[in-house]
Amino acid sequence: MSVTMTLGQLAEVLGATLKGPEALQITGLATLQEAGPTQLSFLANPQYRKYLDNSQAGAVLLKAADAESFAGNTLVVADPYLAYARISHLFDPKPKAEAGIHPSAVVAEDAQVDASASIGPFAVIESGARIGANVSIGAHCFIGARCVVGEGGWLAPRVTLYHDVTIGKRVVIQSGAVIGGEGFGFANEKGIWRKIAQIGGVTIGDDVEIGVNTAVDRGALSDTRIGDGVKLDNQIQIAHNVQIGDHTAMAACVGISGSTRIGKHCMLAGGVGLVGHIDICDNVFVSGMTMVTRSITEPGSYSSGTAMQPLADWRKSAARIRHLDDMAKRLQQLEKRVDTVTSGGLPTSEG
């Protein structure tokens, strides 16, 4: 799909101050380094300012301070990255699904599918499911019994919703995601694991995005819950009974153990792991690969582990760890001797 807009139209959409010809046609978006004369770019990160003056972009989204010294066409905005995010949808080449049910789809007689929804090839919609207005269900999706997909939802091909999953409005779910799979629940009887039926469901709020191959398990008793505006990257594991507050975001490969509760407006970087049955308060940032082993009750930034260093240095540090107990004992002995000397006594012989 090809889209063309004028600079004047884009300025109106963004409420931007235009410096340049209103009639200039823009056909797409690109980086400062790669943009051509009919493309729009942006400067959000100062480390890319070095590419600005030589950019061939037809126009650039800039803050007022950067626009003053730039000779090219500009759309002056308060937040160039946010402006880029807003207009990116105008140039999105993703095909638009047509309303209707593909002949190869299997839809239960009592399922409710809005006339404006699109059901792709070989999709399966089971008994009691409800598909809202303007929903797009991709090819080979499975929508289990009694599921609800709210209006404006978009499910990429091969998304699986087990039974009793409720999804809010404008939710995006990428391919391979599995929502409502059975939680990892077992009771041990003399060394033998006995399965616990997972009889809860999953409830997902509005404006949520779930990435490729991410799993959200159903609750053991009550629902696993994902709040409004939550963004989940690819290959994330959300275990049973987890609760995630509104507008929290998680990067790829995060793993959250069962019954953990995460607050609103949190950010978890890639590879973060959380043990089960802990609480994370609102407005917490956790850096990449951190292992969270206890509740966090104060907003702020948290990390664990050691930072990257040259291999030879890391090996030396790792070798010293083996001697920490001995070094601690020797330090205690030295502290005792120092205390004795500074207090006017005589040091005792400790071998």
From Swiss-Prot:
Active site: 240
Superkingdom in the source lineage: Bacteria
GO molecular function: N-acyltransferase activity
Keywords: Acyltransferase, Lipid A biosynthesis, Lipid biosynthesis, Lipid metabolism, Repeat, Transferase
Keyword Lipoprotein: no
Catalytic activity: a UDP-3-O-[(3R)-3-hydroxyacyl]-alpha-D-glucosamine + a (3R)-hydroxyacyl-[ACP] = a UDP-2-N,3-O-bis[(3R)-3-hydroxyacyl]-alpha-D-glucosamine + holo-[ACP] + H(+)
Enzyme class, spelled out: transferase
CDD domains, per database record: LbH_LpxD (cd03352)
GO cellular component: membrane
Listed InterPro entries: Hexapep (IPR001451), Hexapep_transf_CS (IPR018357), LpxD (IPR007691), Trimer_LpxA-like_sf (IPR011004), UDP_GlcNAc_AcTrfase_non-rep (IPR020573)
Gene3D superfamilies in the cross-refs: 1.20.5.170, Hexapeptide repeat proteins, MurE/MurF, N-terminal domain
Function: Catalyzes the N-acylation of UDP-3-O-acylglucosamine using 3-hydroxyacyl-ACP as the acyl donor. Is involved in the biosynthesis of lipid A, a phosphorylated glycolipid that anchors the lipopolysaccharide to the outer membrane of the cell.
Family: Belongs to the transferase hexapeptide repeat family. LpxD subfamily.
PANTHER family the UniProt entry points to: UDP-3-O-ACYLGLUCOSAMINE N-ACYLTRANSFERASE, UDP-3-O-ACYLGLUCOSAMINE N-ACYLTRANSFERASE 1, MITOCHONDRIAL-RELATED
Name of this chain's protein: UDP-3-O-acylglucosamine N-acyltransferase
Organism: Pseudomonas putida (strain ATCC 47054 / DSM 6125 / CFBP 8728 / NCIMB 11950 / KT2440)
UniProt gene name: lpxD
